[in-house]
């Protein structure tokens, strides 16, 4: 007992020293923490002061910069206003000057016109009436003649066309029959060649599939038999293991129950001894602590008094701070309310002004646009009027000149009496005519040269434009093809990569799973072994302790041991009987369970099999659906793209037409406006951008700086709080250990305080949230009100504007009607004047020009007739071509359907084979999976057996050790006298024996582990060899199959390539034949042209000789007819002149009255218009100045409000930061005080408790010890419970506080983000406005350039096309003329011969023959001379025609060569890309097959073949679509060309008729 007491004393001294050391360390830490916090706060205060000084400096500098910027802006605005005023003044002065000049010129012209108008009218009206009557009668006669001739020609034309069509139809049917026979022969030959290999391939495939199915079936049968055997074996083993396991569990539970009872009894005895020792130790500790507590009480009292005084001072301080904060809050609230009211008022004013300015701007823009449109319309009308005036001036000049000539003519007429004067005037007239004809010839030569030069230039431009268009089209087609190929490659790559990644992930997952399973098994084994070792060591320790305690009390327990042995014996006998009964019951239960489990397993297997079949069927269905969906989606995509392309083309055409119309209207006005405003806008934009960017960068820098400072402060605060929180946690842990009692009281107070704070925060937060909502609602209502008012104002302005616009439109319509009526009257007057002049002039040269006109009319009529014939021929050709194309497309579609059918049969065959393969692979996988499961089960079984043996060995060892302990205890009881010596010796012996046994166990385990490893290695070798054999066999099978598939694929590829080559060869052959035909046709045409020219020359010579004779006869007849016509004509002329004079006088009177009334109206309108223009200009200037002033004021208000808002935001941020810092600082102080108070309170309670314990200890020591233990446990439990109860609300409050702070920070962030967004949006709007202006100017310029380029290209194409049409029409007319000449010549010769034969008798035949021979001999020289001249003329004509045709041919051949080259390059590039793509795909597939050959090589190869097949099918389909698209494009171009040709012909006819009318009007 003395030794124990000394030990306890020693340990108590150590504890006291440790406690004092901990107290000292904690106090030192507190002082250190206090000093550090004071230093930190002081440094933060200094930093804050420096930041405030910097902010004040920055604020003053920014105010100075703002003031300077405002002054500069004001100066700039004043200068801009001055510049605009000067420009307006200059423009108005120039406009007024221009108007004055125009008005003066108009007045002069009008006065001159009025002076000469009345003099002219009478004569002109008379002559016009005469000429109109003449022309009308002539026109009627010509019309009747034309109708008759056209009807005759149309009948001839249709009959000839019918004959030609019939002949061509017969030729076409013959060719078609021959082609069909050739195709049938070729197909038969091809089918005959392919029949044998296809049949052989089918037989081989059937045999191969049969063999594969047989092998699979036999393998499956063997595997299923083996699996069934293994499963049954496994079931029997499981039954046996369950029985064995149950027996072992029952044994262990029974033994554990017996051992637990023994341990419980011993534990109760040791517990009572330990309680006695604890009570003694606590009494000693209490006595020692009393002296220490007395000294500490004095210190605590002094600390407590200081704490109380400090607390009172702090409470007063807190109250004053709170009062100050409330007062400040009220002041700031008042300021904020006042500022808010002012801000809202400013915002309302600003928004209203802004909206008014916006509406004003919109109205001004609309007004400007209306003014612009009005100006444009007025300008257009003025230009139109000027043109009309110019025409009127020209007509007046012509009338004036004509009047002069008329006067001259009248003078000459008066001098008819004098013959000499008349003769001289006649000679002068003849000379003038000759001069005029010379001048005309020279002018026509110059015009021809100039037009030729222009045409050559146009041809050059057209060729350049055609080259550009071709290059652009080729580039586009190549890009489209490349993109389509690239997309298909990307799709294939994605599919392949997805498949590859899936396979890699699967393999990795399986490897990881195996590794995890092995690691888990190893880890669990290690864990179990570790646990066993721990249990073994714990058992050893418990045994040693138990033996030490048992050695003292062994004698007492011998009786109880004997009784226990007897009880155990009886219990063992009863337990044995129960065990036997239990085993029998268990055996019967297990049999029933095994039967039931077998039944359930069979049911599950059947269900799994059915489920697998259903899943496979659904999977196949899914695969088919997926393929069908892909095909459907592809078809829909193609349709969609085609329709989109078609609609896009139509829309593009419409857009181009509308754009061209709009651009022609806009370009005139915009050109003038843009050039004026671009300079001013550029300069203004540059200055504004530079200033704005500088301002923006400064603003951003200030914002970033302020945000960085706030973030730094926030981050430092967080760091400080984290550090303080860590220190607080450390202090809290130490305080919990020392001050358990005081904490409860302090925690309650702290919780009350926190509860008050939380309620205060909640109230503030609740106040803040509705306030924010109220502000948002108020802002929204203000915005809605402003918008609504603006909308109403806009509506009113819109209504006013519409009224004004309606009135303006009515006025404009009336004015335009008046103007149009005036112009029509003027035109009518001018037309009557022109007609009178024309009739007067035509009286002199009417007869001579009638002849020329009839010739031209005949030529035109023949040309029209030939054109109609050619058009009908073209229509027939077109219909035949369309029919041939339809037949060819049908044949192509049939071929494609056949290929698709063959491909579908192949796909179905392959797919069925693939499905059979998949079924086999699924069965194979299930078999492998069952094998793996079975092997894993065997391994787990062996492992469980090993663990059971290990557990059994441990139990045997433990039972053996128990027996040994009991034996040793008996020996120890006998040797009670020599307890210490024998016990020590026995302990050493036992330790040695335990080590020996442990070493034996370790050796056994090691040997067992080694044997297991050897068995595992042997099994792995066998498995590896089996796997290698299986892999080799499978590889051999797959290689064979791959070879067969490879050869079949090569065969298919070769056949398919040969088919493609054949098709390409046929297409190239057709193209070559087509080109050859064209070339031969051109050569034949040239040859025929030469022949025709020769014949034409001969016909011309014959016609000239014939016409000479006919002209002599006609002249005589015409001379007689002319005398009669002149007499009748003179009589008719005198009758008509009287009527025309009468009508003319009436018309002149009417025109003069209307002219006087219109003149008065015009003068009134011009005066009103001038006054309105002056008023508008003054009003616009005034309004512009007002707008500028308002904008300037609004900008100043916005800047001031924005700066105020910025300063207010900064102030709020600083206020928020200071509040957070103050709250943190106060919370830290409160925590520190609370900790000090808890320490003092605990020390007091400890002193009181120790003092009470010392007083009561003398009376009842044993009772007090037990009561202290109970009280201690109860108090600890209660305190813990109370602490946990209080901790939950504190934690919830802390969380809420954290959430509130987070919400506050989020609100601040939201405000900042909203403000930044507002800034960014405003900047973007400004930028967007500037960009839209620049874009509009740029687009206008670009559209103008684009329109000009398009216009030039279209003009070039039109010219080129017109040339081509002209040459074609000339050629066709030439051929028709050639035929007609031949027919005429043949008829003429026949007629001549028949006449001669009739007239000449037989007797004179010899003389005629002699004379003809002499005549032939004489005329031979003349013929040769004429022929040589004709040949020269023909050569010259041929050379000119050949030059034109060669140029055209060369251009066409170049274009054809370039198209062919491009097509060949495209085909070669296509083939190369296809080859590259196929090679890449094959390489990827080979790599994949090579990597996965062991797993599923056959499946991969089949997939590759199917992929290739699908890819080729897709490629052929795509090629077919491309060819089809190209054919459609060519057809469209050809149709457009033909329609353009027709339009050109119509245009030429109209143009020729217009030229004839103009020539007639002009008198040439």
From Swiss-Prot:
GO terms for molecular function: calmodulin binding. SUPFAM superfamilies: P-loop containing nucleoside triphosphate hydrolases (SSF52540). It is found in: Cytoplasm; Nucleus. Keywords: Calmodulin-binding, Cell cycle, Cell division, Cytoplasm, Mitosis, Nucleus, Repeat. GO terms for biological process: cell division. The keyword rRNA-binding does not apply. GO terms for cellular component: cytoplasm; nucleus. It holds the Pfam family IQ. InterPro entries: CellDiv_DevSignal_Domain, IQ_motif_EF-hand-BS, P-loop_NTPase. PROSITE patterns: IQ. Residues 31-60, 220-251, 270-299, 293-322, 366-395, 389-420, 439-468, 462-491, 512-541, 535-566, 608-639, 658-687, 681-712, 731-762, 754-785, 804-835, 827-856, 877-908, 900-931, 949-980, 972-1003, 1022-1053, 1045-1076, 1095-1126, 1168-1199, 1304-1333, 1327-1358, 1377-1406, 1452-1483, 1474-1503, 1500-1531 form the IQ domain. Probable role in mitotic spindle regulation and coordination of mitotic processes. May have a preferential role in regulating neurogenesis. This is Abnormal spindle-like microcephaly-associated protein homolog. It comes from Ateles geoffroyi (Black-handed spider monkey).
């Amino acid at each position: 007992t003395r030794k124990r007491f000394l030990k306890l004393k020693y340990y108590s001294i150590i504890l006291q020293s440790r406690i004092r050391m901990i107290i000292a360390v904690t106090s030192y830490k507190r002082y250190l923490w206090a000093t550090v916090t004071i230093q930190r706060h002081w440094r933060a205060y200094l930093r804050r002061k420096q930041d405030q000084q910097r902010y004040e400096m920055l604020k003053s500098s920014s105010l100075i910069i703002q003031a300077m910027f405002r002054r500069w802006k004001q100066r700039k605005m004043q200068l801009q206003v001055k510049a605009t005023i000067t420009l307006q003044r200059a423009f108005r002065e120039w406009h007024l000057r221009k108007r004055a000049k125009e008005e003066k010129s108009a007045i002069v012209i009008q006065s001159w016109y009025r002076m000469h108008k009345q003099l002219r009218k009478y004569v002109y009206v008379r002559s016009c009436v005469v000429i109109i009557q003449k022309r009308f009668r002539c026109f009627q006669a010509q019309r009747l003649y034309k109708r008759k001739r056209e009807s005759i020609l149309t009948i001839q034309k249709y009959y000839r066309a019918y004959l030609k069509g019939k002949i061509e139809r017969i030729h076409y049917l013959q060719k078609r029959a021959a082609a069909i026979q050739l195709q049938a022969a070729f197909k038969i030959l091809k089918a005959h060649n392919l029949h044998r290999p296809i049949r052989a391939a089918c037989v081989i495939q059937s045999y191969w599939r049969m063999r594969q199915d047989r092998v699979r079936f036999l393998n499956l049968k063997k595997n299923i038999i083996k699996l069934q055997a293994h499963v049954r074996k496994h079931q029997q083993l499981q039954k046996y293991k369950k029985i064995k396991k149950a027996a072992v569990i029952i044994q262990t539970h029974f033994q554990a129950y017996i051992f637990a009872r023994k341990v419980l009894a011993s534990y109760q005895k040791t517990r009572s001894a330990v309680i006695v020792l604890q009570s003694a130790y606590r009494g000693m500790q209490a006595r020692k602590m009393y002296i220490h507590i007395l000294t500490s009480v004095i210190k605590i009292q002094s600390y407590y008094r200081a704490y109380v005084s400090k607390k009172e001072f702090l409470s007063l301080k807190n109250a004053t701070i709170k009062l100050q904060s409330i007062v400040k809050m009220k002041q700031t609230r008042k300021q904020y309310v006042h500022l808010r009211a002012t801000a809202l008022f400013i915002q309302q004013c600003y928004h209203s002004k802004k909206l008014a300015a916006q509406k004003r701007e919109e109205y001004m823009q609309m007004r400007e646009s209306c003014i612009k449109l009005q100006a444009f319309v007025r300008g257009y009308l003025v230009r139109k009027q000027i043109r009309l005036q110019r025409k009127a001036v020209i007509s007046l000049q012509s009338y004036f000149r004509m009047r002069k000539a008329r006067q001259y003519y009248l003078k000459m007429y008066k001098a008819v009496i004098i013959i000499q004067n008349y003769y001289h005037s006649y000679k002068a007239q003849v000379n003038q005519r000759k001069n005029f004809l010379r001048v005309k010839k020279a002018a026509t030569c110059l015009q021809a040269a100039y037009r030729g030069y222009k045409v050559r230039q146009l041809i050059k431009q057209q060729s350049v434009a055609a080259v550009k268009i071709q290059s652009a089209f080729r580039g586009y087609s190549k890009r489209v093809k490349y993109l389509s190929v690239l997309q298909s490659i990307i799709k294939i790559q994605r599919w392949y990569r997805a498949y590859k990644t899936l396979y890699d992930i699967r393999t990795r997952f399986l490897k990881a799973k195996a590794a995890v399973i092995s690691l888990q098994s190893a880890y669990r084994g290690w864990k179990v072994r570790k646990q066993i070792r721990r249990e073994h060591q714990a058992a050893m320790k418990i045994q040693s302790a138990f033996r030490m305690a048992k050695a003292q009390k062994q004698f007492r327990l011998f009786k109880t041991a004997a009784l226990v042995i007897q009880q155990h014996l009886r219990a063992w006998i009863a337990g044995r009987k129960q065990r036997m009964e239990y085993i029998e019951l268990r055996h019967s239960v297990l049999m029933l369970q095994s039967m039931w489990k077998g039944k359930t397993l069979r049911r599950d297997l059947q269900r799994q099999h059915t489920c697998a079949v259903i899943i496979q069927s659904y999977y196949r269905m899914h695969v088919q659906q997926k393929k069908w969906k892909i095909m459907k989606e592809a078809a829909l995509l193609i349709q969609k793209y085609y329709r989109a392309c078609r609609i896009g083309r139509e829309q593009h055409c419409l857009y181009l037409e509308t754009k061209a119309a709009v651009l022609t209207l806009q370009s005139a006005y915009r050109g003038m406006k843009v050039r004026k405003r671009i300079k001013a806008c550029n300069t203004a934009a540059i200055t504004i951008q530079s200033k704005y960017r500088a301002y923006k960068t400064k603003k951003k820098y200030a914002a970033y700086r302020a945000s960085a400072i706030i973030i730094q402060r926030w981050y430092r605060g967080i760091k400080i709080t984290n550090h303080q929180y860590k220190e607080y946690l450390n202090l809290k842990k130490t305080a919990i250990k020392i001050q358990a009692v005081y904490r409860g009281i302090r925690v309650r107070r702290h919780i009350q305080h926190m509860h008050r704070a939380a309620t205060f925060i909640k109230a503030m937060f609740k106040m803040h949230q509705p306030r924010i909502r109220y502000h948002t609602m108020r802002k929204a209502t203000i915005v809605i009100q402003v918008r609504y008012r603006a909308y109403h104002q806009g509506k009113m302005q819109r209504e006013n504007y519409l009224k004004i616009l309606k009135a303006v439109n009515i006025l404009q319509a009336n004015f335009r009607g008046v103007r149009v009526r005036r112009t029509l009257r003027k035109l009518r007057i001018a037309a009557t004047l022109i007609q009178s002049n024309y009739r007067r002039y035509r009286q002199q040269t009417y007869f001579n020009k009638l002849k020329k006109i009839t010739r031209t009319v005949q030529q035109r009529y023949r040309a029209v007739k030939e054109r109609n014939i050619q058009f009908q021929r073209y229509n027939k050709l077109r219909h035949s071509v369309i029919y041939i194309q339809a037949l060819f497309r049908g044949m192509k579609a049939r071929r494609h359907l056949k290929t698709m059918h063959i491909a579908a049969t192949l796909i179905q065959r392959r797919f069925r084979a693939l499905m059979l393969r998949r079924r086999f692979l699924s069965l194979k996988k299930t078999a492998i999976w069952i094998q793996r499961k079975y092997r894993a089960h065997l391994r787990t079984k062996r492992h469980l057996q090993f663990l059971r043996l290990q557990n059994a060995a441990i139990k045997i060892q433990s039972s053996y050790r128990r027996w040994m302990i009991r034996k040793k205890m008996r020996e120890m009881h006998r040797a009670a006298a020599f307890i210490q010596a024998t016990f020590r010796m026995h302990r050493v012996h036992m330790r040695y024996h335990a080590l020996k046994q442990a070493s034996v166990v370790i050796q056994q385990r090691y040997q067992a582990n080694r044997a297991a490893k050897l068995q595992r290695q042997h099994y792995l070798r066998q498995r590896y060899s089996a796997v290698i054999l299986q892999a080799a066999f499978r590889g051999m099978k797959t290689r064979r199959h791959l070879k067969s598939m490879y050869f079949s694929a090569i065969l298919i590829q070769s056949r398919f390539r040969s088919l493609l080559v054949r098709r390409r060869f046929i297409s190239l052959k057709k193209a070559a034949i087509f080109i050859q035909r064209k070339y031969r046709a051109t050569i034949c045409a040239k040859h025929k042209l030469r022949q025709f020219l020769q014949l034409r020359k001969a016909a011309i010579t014959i016609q000239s000789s014939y016409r000479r004779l006919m002209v002599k006869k006609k002249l005589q007849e015409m001379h007689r007819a002319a005398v009669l016509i002149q007499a009748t004509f003179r009589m008719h002329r005198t009758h008509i002149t009287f009527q025309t004079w009468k009508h003319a006088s009436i018309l002149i009177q009417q025109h003069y009255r209307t002219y006087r009334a219109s003149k008065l109206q015009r003068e009134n309108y011009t005066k009103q218009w001038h006054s309105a223009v002056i008023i508008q200009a003054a009003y616009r200037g005034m309004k512009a100045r007002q707008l500028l002033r308002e904008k300037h004021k609004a900008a100043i208000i916005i800047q001031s409000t924005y700066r105020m808002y910025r300063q207010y935001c900064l102030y709020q941020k600083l206020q928020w930061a200071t509040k957070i810092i103050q709250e943190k600082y106060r919370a830290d102080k409160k925590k520190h005080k609370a900790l000090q108070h808890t320490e003092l309170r605990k020390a007091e309670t400890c002193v009181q408790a120790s003092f009470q314990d010392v007083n009561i200890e003398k009376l009842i020591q044993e009772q007090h010890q037990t009561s202290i233990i109970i009280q201690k446990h109860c108090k600890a439990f209660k305190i813990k419970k109370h602490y946990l109860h209080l901790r939950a609300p504190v934690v919830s409050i802390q969380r809420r506080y954290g959430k509130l702070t987070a919400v506050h920070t989020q609100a601040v962030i939201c405000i900042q983000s909203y403000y930044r967004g507002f800034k960014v949006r405003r900047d973007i709007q400004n930028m967007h406005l500037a960009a839209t202006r620049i874009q509009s100017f740029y687009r206008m310029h670009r559209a103008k350039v684009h329109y000009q380029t398009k216009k030039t290209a279209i003009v070039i194409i039109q010219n080129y096309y017109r040339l081509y049409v002209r040459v074609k029409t000339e050629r066709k007319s030439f051929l028709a003329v050639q035929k007609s000449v031949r027919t005429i010549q043949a008829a003429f010769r026949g007629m001549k011969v028949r006449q001669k034969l009739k007239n000449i008798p037989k007797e004179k035949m010899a003389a005629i023959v002699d004379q003809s021979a002499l005549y032939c001999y004489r005329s031979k020289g003349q013929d040769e001379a004429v022929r040589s001249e004709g040949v020269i003329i023909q050569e010259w004509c041929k050379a000119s025609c050949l030059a034109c045709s060669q140029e055209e041919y060369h251009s066409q051949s170049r274009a054809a060569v370039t198209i062919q080259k491009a097509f060949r390059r495209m085909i070669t590039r296509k083939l190369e890309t296809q080859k590259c793509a196929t090679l890449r795909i094959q390489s990827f597939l080979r790599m994949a097959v090579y990597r996965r050959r062991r797993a599923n090589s056959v499946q991969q190869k089949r997939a590759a073949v199917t992929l290739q097949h699908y890819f080729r099918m897709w490629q052929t389909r795509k090629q077919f679509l491309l060819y089809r698209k190209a054919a459609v494009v060519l057809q469209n171009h050809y149709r457009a060309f033909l329609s353009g040709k027709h339009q050109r012909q119509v245009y030429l006819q109209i143009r020729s008729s217009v030229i004839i009318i103009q020539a007639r009007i002009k008198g040439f």
